[in-house]
Each structure stands twice: as structure tokens, then as C-alpha cells.
Amino acid sequence: MNATHETRATDLDARAVLAALADRWDAADGHGYGELFTPDATYVQFNGVLLSGRREIAEMHDLMFRTMLYGTRLVTGEIESVRRLGEDHAVVVSTGAALYPWQKEATPKRLSRQTLLLERRDGRWLVAGFQNARIKPFPTSGPLFEVASRAVRLRVDRARRAA
């Protein structure tokens, strides 16, 4: 298999995994969602909480689908990159959002970026690692940026003098 064909195949595999995650999410099937992960997977939620293993991932999503994420659907955005790490591993970076029924599309405030480590086991691609983070561009200009930058420099300089 040549590199271009391999990349396309992995891209299709990544799309299939993301579609399966969305299907289980939309069905509010926490345990089915968990089955898409390896038994020893790690999952970092957008708020930084670490879930370890398929069982914990499934149980947390089951709880969330019955409470805070009740009635939501998972909208997968674009796949920004797919990078193969050998025959049976790939790193996928994509965007997406969980939307409530009254939301028609993902607003910038709700949009997240995910990094997934996919692992092929017994011919099936599963998620071995998942990191989810809200997309919040870091300001690099403007009056608030200038004030915050000066405040940081003052505090750092003060701490260095005190040390």
C-alpha cells in the first residue's frame, strides 16, 4: 500500500470512528460509547478531568447523558489532521461540539478540538487516548492584553526580587 492510499484509508477509518462516537452519543448510550475505547484508554474531558479505562469512560458518559448532557447530540466538525504512527496507530485532530436540541449549530463558544490516539486491535480501530479542549484563542494584542502583560511582568519581577 502506498503512502497516499494509506493516508486516505486512515482518514476514512478516523471518520468512521468519529461517526460511531457521534452515533452512540446521539443515542445517549454511555456503555456503547465506552465500547469504542480500548480497555486501558485515557480520556481527558474539556474541563481537565481524567477518566481511566473503558469502564470509567462508559460510566461517566452514561451519567452525563442522563444529566448535564441529556438530549445533546454530538456534531463532528472537520478532521484537521491524521498522522500514522506505524501500522496500527494514528493521531487524529478534529473539531466538534455537543449541542442541545435548541441549538442549531456550534457557536465559537461551544466548539472544541479533540486529539485522539487511535489503535487498531484485531482489525478494529478503537480510541486509546482522547483529549478534549475548548477552542479559546489566546489574545495577542489589544488594551486588555497589554494590561495583563504588564501585570504579569510586574508580579514576576517582584517574585524574583523577593527570592
Regions found by a protein language model. Name each.
Residues R120-R121, V127-A163:
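Low-complexity, intrinsically disordered terminal/linker segments enriched in charged
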Residues L21, Y33-G34, A41, G53, ...:
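Hydrophobic pocket/interface hotspot
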Residues V82, L116-L118:
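A structural signal for short hydrophobic beta-strand segments in well-ordered beta-sheet cores
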Residues M1-P39, F145-A163:
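Short, low-complexity N-terminal intrinsically disordered segments enriched in polar/charged residues
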Residues D26, A98-W102, L118, I135:
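Beta-strand elements of well-folded, non-transmembrane domains
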Residues D13, T42, A58-K104, V156-A162:
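Surface-exposed, charged secondary-structure patches
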Residues N47-G48, Q103-T107:
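Short, solvent-exposed loop/turn segments at secondary-structure boundaries
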